[in-house]
Amino acid sequence: MEVIAKKRFGQNFLINKAIQKAIVDVACVDDENVIEIGPGLGALTDLIKELSKELIAYEIDNDLFKKLLVENQNSNVRFINEDFLNATFDEKKEWVVIGNIPYNITSEILFKLIENHSILKKATLMVQDEVANRLVAMPKTKEYSKLTVSVNFVGNVKKHFVVKASNFNPAPKVDSAIITIDFYKSLPYNLKKVLAFIKQIFAFKRKMLINNLVPQWPKADVIWAIEQIGHKQTTRAEELSLQEIMKLYEILVNSKSN
């Protein structure tokens, strides 16, 4: 059964076997419960299924889903014909995630993983190289953003290697990269509230931090909090490290006049 990549699903199939193996090596699956996002032609699936305790693969493309079922009739893989963004997970188990994810919904997938961090151990993902650079960006750089801080709040992010566009069929217009997120067992603050705070301070990147915060907190409290973390009133969100952002959040939440 010949399968043609569908643009609407953002499909680019990784055809380099050495890189396929390298991705699985980075994932380091060892008798664990695995979720695969977009198995596609099943290249990574074939390698992972021998290493996993349980493997659930979400494939939105009905044609690929049928092909995968035929080729994996006697395996331990459970294929689900569903958009990963609509998926629900068994919260009684700990999962590791792997996938060459559709680049047009990368942020949505990352935030779904963030929301489910408590049942996740690790994620190994193929993303655009530009996105990978954003995820590991340092403060005071143009790549540093809401996404950077949000993902790093729930886990340790590492960029492993770049995958050139020529290793895919069809070849995308940009290079890709492999990243991992090792999720923290617990978080120091409420996830929903912290994500809302991060969104607020990065709402208008050109605005000073104080102007993004004053709608919710009194100006005097904001000025005092910014000074407490060693910054000036003119500071912008992209100048703060994750640790400084969390300290600022803690001070403001505990401020007497809030």
From Swiss-Prot:
GO molecular function, one term: RNA binding
Disulfide-bonded cysteines: none
GO cellular component: cytosol
Pfam families, per the entry: RrnaAD
Catalytic activity line of the entry: adenosine(1518)/adenosine(1519) in 16S rRNA + 4 S-adenosyl-L-methionine = N(6)-dimethyladenosine(1518)/N(6)-dimethyladenosine(1519) in 16S rRNA + 4 S-adenosyl-L-homocysteine + 4 H(+)
Signal peptide feature range: none
HAMAP family: 16SrRNA_methyltr_A (MF_00607)
Protein name, as recorded: Ribosomal RNA small subunit methyltransferase A
